[in-house]
Amino acid sequence: DVQWLDLGHALEAVASLPADNPGVPKAECAEAAYVMYTSGSTGQPKGVMAPHRGVNRLVFANGYADITPEDVLAHFSNPAFDGSTFETWGALLNGARVVIVPQETVLDPVRFGQLLLDEGVTTMFMTIGLFHQYADALAEPLSRLKHLLTGGDVIEPNTIRRVLKYGAPENFMAAYGPTETTTFATTCRLNDLIDEGSQKIPLGRPIGNTQVYILDGQGEPVPIGVTGEIHIGGDGVALGYLNRPELTAERFIPDPFSDEPDARMYRTGDLGYWRADGLIEFVGRNDFQVKVRGFRIELGEIEARLAELSGVRDA
């Protein structure tokens, strides 16, 4: 099938519109750029209000991916998934080209790989599930990438080794970050990290304009090698949950380590520790949240829904 666009009709429609810029107030960096819902597969979804500055720090001077006008980004993430933020604004804010990959092409590794080669894609983000499934089938096009990021769940080290053995992308990175911190908070470059003895992939280091604190139960930083809860501060921290003030106050707390008077940090609920080499190691969760195919699932919400059913005494 050939997709086509009637430019003549489009030009007529554009010509009928006013030539002046619309009178839209200038957006401030601390204002919400979009609302993205998370943990909505069960229970009540939470609308995360991500700020403009969070998107800016995601794709500018970020410390992990230098995107230029010569780059080509593949876009195939669902717009309701925060990975699409990187794909969309990574291209638009850097003057790069974005290639929209149809869903049916993504589901066919042969067609997908050929599209990546034909379009000269240089930069791509893949969820862990898709990466694990396609790492071998897409070995050739993946090896030609300038930037390949993968994240959203636990990475299998053996899959990483196979990609590196075939021929790694120039910058091969694992990315970590809740939606509440605007897509990515840390990245870990994998090209020179993995050896035959590696059993886990660290979360890496904070990206640009992002701070990570690992704190104990009293909110104090823990020493190297000691497990604590991961807190994330900086420009990527969301403004809170839409119309959920109590939950916002619980998860977005004042940042006592920042020089900004109103700065806040996000309590991730993830546990980890600093390694001696400055990388963050992930340990697990401090609650009953799990991930299934990259989706955050609150087990307590499932129990509550089951308990609402007639004939169910407890769950």
Regions found by a protein language model. Name each.
Residues 34, 75, 100, 126, ...:
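A structural signal for the hydrophobic beta-strands that form the central parallel beta-sheet
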Residues 20-37, 44, 67-73, 79, ...:
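Conserved pre-ATP/AMP-binding loop-to-beta segment of ANL
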Residues 1-25, 55, 171-174, 189-315:
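AMP-dependent adenylate-forming
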Residues 32, 77-84, 104, 179, ...:
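Conserved AMP-binding
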Residues 93-96, 121-125, 131, 135-202, ...:
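Gly/Ser/Thr-rich phosphate-binding loop
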Residues 46-74, 82-122, 188, 192:
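Conserved AMP-binding/adenylation subdomain of ANL enzymes
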Residues 11, 96-117, 125-130, 154-155, ...:
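ATP-dependent adenylate-forming carboxylate-activation enzymes
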